[in-house]
UniProtKB/Swiss-Prot annotation:
GO terms for cellular component: cytoplasm. HAMAP family: Arg_tRNA_synth. It catalyses: tRNA(Arg) + L-arginine + ATP = L-arginyl-tRNA(Arg) + AMP + diphosphate. Keywords: Aminoacyl-tRNA synthetase, ATP-binding, Cytoplasm, Ligase, Nucleotide-binding, Protein biosynthesis. Disulfide bonds: none annotated. The keyword Iron does not apply. Pfam families: Arg_tRNA_synt_N (PF03485), DALR_1 (PF05746), tRNA-synt_1d (PF00750). This is Arginine--tRNA ligase. Monomer. It is found in: Cytoplasm. It comes from Pseudomonas entomophila (strain L48). GO terms for biological process: arginyl-tRNA aminoacylation. GO terms for molecular function: arginine-tRNA ligase activity; ATP binding.
Amino acid sequence: MKDTIRQLIQQALTQLVTEGVLPEGLTPAIQVENARDKTHGDFASNIAMMLAKPAGMKPRDLAEKIIAALPTSADISKAEIAGPGFLNFFQNTDALANRLDAALADDHLGVHKAGPVEKVVIDMSAPNLAKEMHVGHLRSTIIGDSVARVLEFLGDDVIRQNHVGDWGTQFGMLLAYLEENPITSDELSDLENFYRAAKKRFDESEEFATRARGLVVKLQAGDPDCLALWTRFKDISLSHCQKTYELLNVKLTMADVMGESAYNDDLANVVADLKSKGLLVESQGAQCVFLEEFKNTEGEPLPVIVQKADGGYLYATTDLAAVRYRSNTLQADRALYFVDQRQALHFNQVFEVARRAGFVGHPMKMEHMGFGTMNGADGRPFKTRDGGTVKLIDLLTEAKERAYALVKEKNPSLAEDELRKIGEVVGIGAVKYADLSKHRTSDYSFNFELMLNFEGNTAPYLLYAYTRVAGVFRKLGKGFDEVDGNIVLQAAHEQDLAARLAQFGEILNNVADKGTPHVLCSYLYDLAGLFSSFYENCPILAAETAEQQQSRLRLAALTGRTLKQGLELLGLETLERM
């Protein structure tokens, strides 16, 4: 609807330019917002106040001219002027009802992408291999997954890339320790303890550390024995990751892995190409690119180091190779990097070097989708009681058990297998939703009690809200798609619910544009609250007429489908009953 109003305003402005009321050459960004007070309409625009000065008119006088020039539209019942010159638009409820009927008949709920369909690379999760995933990997994994789901729903061609840390000095350390302590695959599956023991040996023995560094060189040179052991470590690590992804209900598979090692063969070429473009400067033996846009506190340009003095490559080199691959080989239109916002400087530098070096041959927007940290109750990074790193799988297991105990207490008569299933859906959903509902760039404190609460903006509340809608249809023995008739919007609670339902597409396009799933969370929470008010004030099963019952059932069906689809786009499973 906002796009429709923008188009109407644009047509009016074009008419006013033709009439000489407005000067030529104006290209204003027409803003249309939801009206705060429904008595003043459904949508508002400040365009008259924006253009009053170039028009040489008072805002209200210009607003009158704009309203007079607005084309008629079946979607708008009337437009009015408010305050200093706001334009307020009232939706036509019959047109709104028709849109919702069409949405209910559509597999995509009437949602379409606002712009052209694109090929989008999502760089997400990216754990370091050779040890298990920890809680620090949660945000990149689930935020990236949710945005990828939304983009796919809108029609984009999404390529997920799990840029795992599968190369580097830690593997030399592990290989050296494995040489000293040959063990079985079963023993090796306990990666955390094996890594800890190898790290202890590395820190305590200079001879061991020297041998480990030598094995890194052999590994990088393609030594068959080293490569075989490295592959063994990598496969075990990835199997650990895959179990976590499956428990999280995240759409990442082995086929999506494109780790650091995948770019090894191109690293020397990256350095050579930077040199041929005249971008490299040697500094203390290292090969660097200096960019004037990025300076230290003394005002000196910061180096982007692509090759160390000993010939080794760095993260920047690998990331530059990845940019080139994603642009030139994958032909991506966008590349979204879901990486901790503390890496913002790194990515801004890499993106600028890539542009200057001509590595972005196919026009590709590069966007760092940074995020804040998940902290403990004390506001510090989340740790175990003894200060260790919390394994992600352990956190999720605890969430399942806590949710199971909570559900069993409320529903002791349910069968054990159903209790376990509900516990898993609620527990995993609670952890994910608590994260996704926060603004991506914000830090937040992890709190089981808050996230498992059945009140407030939580997964349990939304999951229960969905089962409440499903329960209406279960009583009737019908599905969401088995309701005849048409939507008729008469009561205020019907109109409020309908207006919010109609905004689903706008919300999803917002998430796709900015990479912010919390916007979808807020929408679903608001929608659930509006349905609750509608359900309490507009009887469905006890409606006054058959037509009224069908209309309200159709509103309920569209609410149920929207809640289910929205939760699925967040990566949350739903339940038919709790």
